[in-house]
Amino acid sequence: MSSGIQLRHRLDAFQLDAAFEFGNSPGVSALFGPSGAGKSTIINAIAGLIAPEFGRIVINGETLLDTERGLSVPARARRIGVVFQDTRLFPHLDVQGNLLYGSRRAPVKSDASRTAAVVGLLGLEGLLNRRPRTLSGGERSRVALGRALLMNPRALLLDEPLAALDAARKAEILPYLERLVHETQIPMLYVSHSLDEVARLADRMIVIDKGRVIAEGSVFDLSARLDLVAGSPLLPGVILQAKIAAHDEAHALTELELAGESVVVPRIAKAIGETVRIRIDAPDVMLALSRPEGVSANNILPVLVTAIEQTGPNADVQLALKEARLVARITRRSLERLALKPGTAVFAVIKSVTVGGREHL
């Protein structure tokens, strides 16, 4: 393989047996799954912090681990930047000292211009002389990101960097992560069990459960697969890409074009023709056999039922909007009352749409 991960490792009763593509191109691959699935074990193995029983790790053509050949590049020489949820900053150093520690681990020492660029990218200018204990959780996360970037890493591993933050701190740091994704050319593996974070940041998704990869592919394709959410605690929903078609200044609305249909959301500060990612959660989709009249919902879309997955009292219904896919979560009673089956034409009433992390009615 040109680039990718193959790992087998046993830890007490837990068995990891995972293989997936990573590291051949820039962008974010989300390692997605419930707690205890093996995500952090994979991160530690790639970083060289644990030695798996069997493994092959190739990133951008460079072999970092090949147990069959007896090859294992030491962690300090792998040039893998890692950001953990507890940040692991040095408490005795100020922010500038923590950043310089990262630059000292780079193969070529970062010059002042690169350091200034990273400081500016992450908005750290006013924090350089402060100690970690005086920083908010979001500020500490940004410093940890900066330290990892100044290593000039061949890949960046983000192990649930927002898990310890409250909603306000997450909202603070997500825009910086988005800038990082757009302005660097580093392959990133982002560990999360938050579909909202995956929707905003990732291009690809690797779904892991009980130590095994059960699916990998684009976030748009995998988010609509019923088999990946049935019976799991993960909230079903889809991630879609839409294009800004028009702005209604009089009502402070933006009209998005999605598979030839119109989706209306509150005003987005982007130009006509630009693309945006949206997320529609399955519980926010109602189904009707005929187009509802006299309702407050702005978004009512004609769709076709393509698949149904029943779990307990609920039914997840996959819907086709031309080439796009939606998912509705309804009760089994509603499923029976509407007599839904693959091929049934219905209308999807969208109660809310999330754009860029903001929920819109």
Language-model-detected regions and their locations in the chain:
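Glycine/charge-rich catalytic "coupling/switch" loops of P-loop NTPases
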Residues: 262-309, 325-361
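A short, proline-enriched helix->beta-strand linker immediately N-terminal to the Walker B motif
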Residues: 150-154
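Conserved ABC ATPase signature
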Residues: 131-135, 139
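ABC-type ATPase nucleotide-binding domains, specifically the catalytic core motifs of the NBD
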Residues: 93, 97-112
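Conserved ABC ATPase "signature" region
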Residues: 62-67, 110-127, 178-179
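ABC ATPase NBD coupling module
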Residues: 64-81, 105, 113
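Internal alpha/beta loop-helix hairpins
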Residues: 182, 192-261
